[in-house]
Regions:
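Canonical Rossmann dinucleotide-binding motif of NAD(H)/NADP(H)-dependent dehydrogenases/reductases
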Residues: 8-47
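Conserved glycine-rich Rossmann-like NAD(P)H-binding loop of the short-chain dehydrogenase/reductase
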Residues: 38-66
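The beta1-alpha1 cofactor-binding region of Rossmann-like NAD(H)/NADP(H)-dependent oxidoreductases
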Residues: 61-62, 82-94, 128
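Rossmann-fold cofactor-recognition segment
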Residues: 69-88
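Conserved NAD(P)H cofactor-binding loop of Rossmann-fold oxidoreductase domains
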Residues: 111-119
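Substrate-binding pocket helix/loop in short-chain dehydrogenase/reductase
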Residues: 119-123, 127-132
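A short, exposed helix-loop element centered on a Lys and neighboring polar residues
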Residues: 146-147
Length: 150
């Protein structure tokens, strides 16, 4: 992030959700937090490689594993965890795994978002199931992460 310098993160632990895409803002957040001295847990839904866009396939991208490697390249610890932020059991399991590995969490970055295409239509054309997915990930997911890690 050009022009932005983070401070006060040395020795802290962060969980960044929804950062499996190569062009995700979550990727930049995770890497910059690591550069500032933060250990980072990165989460995503674990997309299958056949669902990667062409630029990710060409680059040899591996979803959250690639970002975890970028975090580790800064000298910080990283943990990549496949997790569905909209599912209470998944978030509870994530919480247990992260606390077991790091002992605490100092920051949650609720970056996961479901807006990927089917919901980008006039509201009268929007399928109810597509709307409900957006609500589950964007709203309920943020609540669950804050609730379990809070």
């Amino acid at each position: 992030m050009a022009g932005l310098e983070l401070s006060g993160l040395a020795g802290k632990v962060a969980v960044v959700t929804g950062r499996g895409r190569m062009r995700s803002i979550g990727r930049s957040i995770a890497v910059e937090m690591a550069r500032a001295g933060c250990d980072v847990v990165v989460t995503g839904t674990g997309r299958a490689p056949e669902n990667y866009p062409d630029d990710e396939k060409t680059a040899g991208w591996r979803d959250i594993e690639s970002v975890a490697e970028e975090v580790e390249a800064t000298g910080q610890r990283a943990l990549a965890v496949v997790s569905d932020v909209s599912d209470p059991a998944s978030v509870e399991a994530l919480t247990a795994q992260v606390l077991g590995e790091f002992g605490r969490v100092d920051f949650i970055v609720n970056n996961a978002g479901a807006a990927r295409g089917p919901d980008r239509v006039p509201v009268v054309d929007l399928a109810i199931d597509d709307w409900m997915k957006v609500i589950r990930v964007n709203l309920t997911g943020t609540f669950l992460m804050s609730h379990f890690f809070g």
